[in-house]
């Protein structure tokens, strides 16, 4: 589940300007190229999916660092990813073209570094006093490096071919592969570490409040991290072998658009964009809170720890399978009508907090996946309409589409950072004990609030803002065909 990237992602779009619909034969991409391009985005989704569901549980129960330090690690990591977005676009835009292109060296160069950062994020160091600093540093590094990969990788779509149709096809391959990576990440990681958090974990310990960490548990997490990290060199090799960046013959001309901060000042005054961004600040933060606390809730606030892996799998499978359905609903009934699909999870989340039983949990997992799918699909469907509306009212140079997308990602990442940081800090105030088998009643109540009331309130607030906000005007067909096609090149989720 993913996001756009890069304030001014290097040479994109204009180099190959071509009338829509003119699909020259020499602009076609082979199926092999599209598949290899799609595979290149898999590792980031695998890693993001695994960390979204299991990182908090690992930091509290295995690394056994205080909840306040977990809060700092999550907040710092998300903020570093948000800040890295415009920074990456700036440096990539300033870089020179090499023999392998301008974007490919950045994407391929980041991959081994991301793999190392990800592995050490799940490694249990021998010392205990500085573990909080260890995990904060590596999570910040992982998020920043992942962004430095994703910016050039998504921008690469625009200079693979001059054909808009082939660009759309390459983007479809990428998003399909990324959805598969999202599903694979949490599934593989969960299967490897499932025995570490079963109901038998505390049965043999004489100190159930805070059992020692078994070396086997630490080893399982290292194995899971190594498996995920290995996807980076494997997929990176296929990306390098199967995809060739085309020459950008007009990069200087394409770089004369708005810079990020000037463009942000202009776009932030556009009412439909403000409505969309503010509404999905709440909705995306609610989804991240729901994802992050489901595993903790099942482990410490209910007796569902043996069902965690199945519940995570159901959420992801239902999200992937329901995406085509939501695409049809968007076309058939309209985008604002489809937004009501997000609130389907609200009553079920409250039901799970009130009645934490296995049958209820499985139903909630399925419905949550369906709602998460539309919450991820809807903003990327509405943003192009907002961009079209803005371009009809203003005459701006190239780069404005990128500013819309990158600023949206920037703000949603910051909202996720704040939501996860504050919510995890609330566990500290409730008296959460790192590594404890049995948490205090205050912690159990807090987890129920975080899994039920908090996402519910945030989703309802976001939907109200979205539904009462201004609707962008739809351009005429002839005008729409002349608007930039660059907007379809970003996005991926976590």
From Swiss-Prot:
Effect of substituting residue 147 to A: Decreased export of sphingosine-1-phosphate
InterPro entries: MFS_2 (IPR039672), MFS_trans_sf (IPR036259)
Positions of the UniProt region annotated as Disordered: 1-26, 473-494
Topology relative to the membrane: Multi-pass membrane protein
Tissue occurrence: Widely expressed with highest expression in spleen, lung and testis. Predominantly expressed in erythroid lineages giving rise to erythrocytes and platelets, but absent in lymphoid lineages.
Tree of life domain: Eukaryota
Reaction(s) catalysed by this chain's protein: sphing-4-enine 1-phosphate(in) = sphing-4-enine 1-phosphate(out); sphinganine 1-phosphate(in) = sphinganine 1-phosphate(out); sphinga-4E,14Z-dienine-1-phosphate(in) = sphinga-4E,14Z-dienine-1-phosphate(out)
Effect of loss of the gene: Mice were born with normal gross appearance and thrived. An accumulation of sphingosine-1-phosphate in red blood cells is observed, while sphingosine-1-phosphate level in plasma is significantly reduced. Mice display hemolysis associated with red blood cell stomatocytes, and the hemolytic phenotype is severely increased with signs of membrane fragility under stress erythropoiesis. Mice significantly reduced thrombus formation.
Bias-annotated ranges (Basic residues): 485-494
Listed Pro residues bias regions: 1-12
Swiss-Prot/TrEMBL keywords: Cell membrane, Lipid transport, Membrane, Transmembrane, Transmembrane helix, Transport
Record's keyword annotation contains Transmembrane helix: yes
Gene Ontology terms describing biological process: carbohydrate transport; lipid transport; positive regulation of platelet aggregation; sphingosine-1-phosphate receptor signaling pathway
Membrane spanning residue stretches: 103-123, 140-160, 179-199, 223-243, 277-297, 310-330, 339-359, 360-380, 402-422, 449-469
Intracellular or extracellular location(s): Cell membrane
Main location: membrane
GO terms for cellular component: plasma membrane
GO molecular function: sphingolipid transporter activity; symporter activity
Family designation: Belongs to the major facilitator superfamily.
Function: Lipid transporter that specifically mediates export of sphingosine-1-phosphate in red blood cells and platelets. Sphingosine-1-phosphate is a signaling sphingolipid and its export from red blood cells into in the plasma is required for red blood cell morphology. Sphingosine-1-phosphate export from platelets is required for platelet aggregation and thrombus formation. Mediates the export of different sphingosine-1-phosphate (S1P) species, including S1P(d18:0) (sphinganine 1-phosphate), S1P (d18:1) (sphing-4-enine 1-phosphate) and S1P (d18:2) (sphinga-4E,14Z-dienine-1-phosphate).
Name this polypeptide is given: Sphingosine-1-phosphate transporter MFSD2B
Species this chain originates from: Mus musculus (Mouse)
């Amino acid at each position: 589940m993913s996001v756009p990237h890069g304030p001014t992602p290097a040479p994109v779009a204009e180099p190959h300007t071509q009338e829509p619909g003119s699909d020259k034969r020499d602009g076609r991409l082979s199926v092999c190229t599209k598949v290899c391009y799609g595979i290149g985005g898999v590792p980031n989704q695998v890693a993001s999916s695994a960390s979204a569901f299991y990182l908090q549980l690992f930091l509290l129960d295995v690394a056994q660092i205080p909840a306040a330090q977990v809060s700092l690690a999550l907040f710092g990591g998300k903020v570093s990813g948000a800040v890295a977005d415009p920074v990456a676009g700036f440096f990539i835009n300033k870089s020179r073209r090499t023999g392998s292109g301008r974007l490919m060296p950045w994407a391929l160069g980041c991959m081994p570094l991301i793999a190392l950062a990800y592995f050490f994020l799940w490694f249990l160091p021998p010392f205990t006093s500085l573990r909080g600093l260890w995990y904060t540093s590596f999570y910040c590094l992982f998020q920043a490096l992942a962004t430095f990969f994703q910016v050039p990788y998504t921008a690469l779509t625009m200079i693979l071919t001059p054909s808009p149709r082939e660009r759309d096809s390459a983007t479809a391959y990428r998003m399909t592969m990324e959805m598969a990576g999202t599903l694979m990440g949490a599934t593989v990681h969960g299967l490897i570490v499932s025995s570490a958090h079963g109901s038998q974990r505390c049965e043999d310990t004489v100190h159930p409040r805070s059992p020692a960490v078994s070396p086997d548990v630490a080893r399982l997490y290292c194995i899971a991290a190594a498996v995920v990290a290995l996807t980076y060199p494997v997929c990176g090799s296929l990306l390098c072998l199967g995809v060739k960046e085309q020459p950008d013959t007009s990069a200087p001309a394409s770089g004369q658009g708005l810079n990020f901060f000037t463009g942000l000042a202009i776009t932030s005054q556009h009412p439909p964009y403000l409505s969309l961004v503010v509404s999905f600040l709440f909705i995306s933060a609610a989804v991240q809170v729901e994802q992050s606390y489901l595993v903790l809730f099942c482990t410490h606030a209910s007796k569902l720890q043996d069902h965690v892996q199945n519940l995570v799998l159901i959420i992801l499978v239902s999200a992937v399978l329901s995406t085509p359905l939501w695409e049809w609903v968007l076309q058939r009934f309209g985008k604002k009508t489809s937004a009501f699909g997000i609130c389907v999870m609200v009553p079920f989340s409250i039901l799970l907090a009130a009645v934490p039983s296995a049958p209820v949990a499985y139903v909630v997992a399925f419905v949550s996946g369906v709602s998460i799918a539309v919450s991820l699909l809807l903003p990327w469907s509405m943003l192009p309409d907002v961009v079209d509306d803005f371009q009809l009212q203003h005459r701006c140079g190239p780069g404005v589409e990128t500013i819309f997308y990158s600023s949206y990602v920037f703000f949603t990442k910051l909202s996720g950072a704040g939501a996860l940081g504050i919510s995890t800090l609330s566990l500290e105030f409730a008296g959460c004990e790192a590594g404890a088998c049995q948490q205090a009643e205050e912690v159990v109540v807090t987890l129920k609030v975080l899994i039920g009331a908090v996402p519910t309130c945030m989703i309802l607030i976001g939907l109200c803002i979205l539904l009462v906000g201004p609707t962008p005007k739809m351009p005429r067909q002839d005008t729409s065909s002349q608007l930039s096609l660059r907007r379809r090149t970003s996005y991926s989720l976590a």
